[in-house]
């Protein structure tokens, strides 16, 4: 009787995973769901209160609350880690803070269960931008733009990954990094097909530039069912059909990230006058606007 844990089920990724599990649940599955707002979850998924398969257990609490995490992770063989912050601002740490709390909680569970403790496999949403074997397929200009704009979000994820790897070395958990390309059509239910990309070869299979959240959710569920194939390594997800592309939303995230970089620069103490800093701020934001056009244009070719 497997138990899965889903951390964050009201965002686009967590919702997509939940829809997939509800549509085709593994046999005899228990599903523990940790959310900040049970009311918000049930508004999106009203049938959860009457769902028989899988068996649903909803835990309301913060992702850094070890008591809530213990309830969610108890007996879990797989945990889908979907807690993240879309804002790429200096100091963002939600993902790393959550992973720190997860590691602390697993340490508590191992102490509680002793030799009967079974280390779960954590599936962490990452990004193809952080996977050299996948990011090398992206034009360098586009890669540099994305890395610049999402710098602080990427730092948060990198720190989280360092926590995973240290915990895995101690036998507390195994991890799998799930690396999609650009993700589109948040909360859209329609799947068009996906394929997993092994990152073991020196040269990976081609990754398409656009993937729907629905197909990403299905990819997560497939990885969970094949976790032994990908333990402690990254795996790419790519589309096999035509995703509904929502470049305007992604451009907004990149633009906000560029503003976050400029804001951090503005706030640093530098031997520049305010007019000079204001000029630099305007240049950076204008550059971000120009390169976003280049980014979306390149991706649509």
Curated annotation (Swiss-Prot):
Pathway membership: Mycotoxin biosynthesis
Residues carrying a glycan: 62, 86, 190
Induction summary: Expression is positively regulated by the dothistromin-specific transcription factor aflR. Dothistromin biosynthetic proteins are co-regulated, showing a high level of expression at ealy exponential phase with a subsequent decline in older cultures.
Keyword annotations from UniProtKB, A to Z: Glycoprotein, Oxidoreductase, Signal
Oxidoreductase recorded as keyword: yes
Molecular function as annotated in GO: oxidoreductase activity, acting on the CH-NH group of donors, NAD or NADP as acceptor
Superkingdom assignment: Eukaryota
Protein EC: 1.-.-.-
Cited InterPro entries: NAD(P)-bd_dom_sf (IPR036291), Polyketide_Oxido-like (IPR051606)
Enzyme kind, highest EC tier: oxidoreductase
Signal peptide feature range: 1-23
Family statement: Belongs to the avfA family.
Matching PANTHER family: FLAVIN REDUCTASE (NADPH) (PTHR43355:SF2)
Role according to the record: Averufin oxidase A; part of the fragmented gene cluster that mediates the biosynthesis of dothistromin (DOTH), a polyketide toxin very similar in structure to the aflatoxin precursor, versicolorin B. The first step of the pathway is the conversion of acetate to norsolorinic acid (NOR) and requires the fatty acid synthase subunits hexA and hexB, as well as the polyketide synthase pksA. PksA combines a hexanoyl starter unit and 7 malonyl-CoA extender units to synthesize the precursor NOR.
Protein name as it appears in the record: Averufin oxidase A
Organism (species): Dothistroma septosporum (Red band needle blight fungus)
Lineage: Eukaryota, Fungi, Dikarya, Ascomycota, Pezizomycotina
The gene coding this protein: avfA
């Amino acid at each position: 009787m497997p138990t899965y844990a889903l951390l964050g089920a009201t965002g686009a990724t967590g919702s997509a995973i939940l829809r997939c599990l509800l549509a085709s649940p593994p046999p005899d599955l228990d599903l523990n769901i940790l959310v900040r707002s049970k009311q918000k979850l049930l508004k999106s998924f009203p049938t959860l209160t009457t769902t028989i398969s899988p068996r649903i257990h909803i835990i309301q609490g913060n992702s850094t609350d070890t008591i809530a995490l213990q309830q969610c992770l108890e007996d879990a063989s797989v945990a889908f880690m979907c807690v993240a912050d879309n804002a790429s601002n200096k100091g963002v740490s939600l993902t790393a803070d959550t992973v720190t709390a997860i590691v602390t909680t697993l340490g508590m569970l191992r102490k509680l269960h002793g030799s009967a403790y079974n280390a779960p496999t954590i599936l962490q949403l990452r990004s193809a931008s952080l996977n050299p074997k996948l990011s090398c397929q992206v034009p360098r200009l586009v890669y540099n733009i994305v890395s610049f704009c999402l710098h602080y979000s990427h730092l948060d994820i990198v720190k989280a990954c360092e926590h995973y790897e240290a915990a895995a070395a101690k036998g507390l958990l195994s991890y799998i990094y799930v690396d999609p390309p650009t993700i589109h059509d948040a909360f859209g239910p329609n799947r068009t097909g996906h394929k997993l990309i092994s990152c073991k070869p020196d040269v990976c299979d081609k990754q398409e530039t656009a993937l729907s959240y629905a197909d990403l959710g299905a990819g997560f569920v497939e990885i969970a069912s094949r976790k032994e194939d990908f333990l402690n390594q990254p795996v790419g997800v790519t589309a096999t059909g035509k995703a509904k592309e929502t470049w305007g939303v992604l451009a907004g995230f990149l633009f906000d990230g560029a503003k976050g970089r400029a804001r951090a620069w503005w706030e640093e103490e530098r031997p520049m006058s305010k007019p000079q800093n204001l000029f630099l701020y305007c240049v950076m934001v204008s550059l971000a606007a120009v390169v976003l056009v280049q980014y979306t244009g390149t991706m649509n070719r």
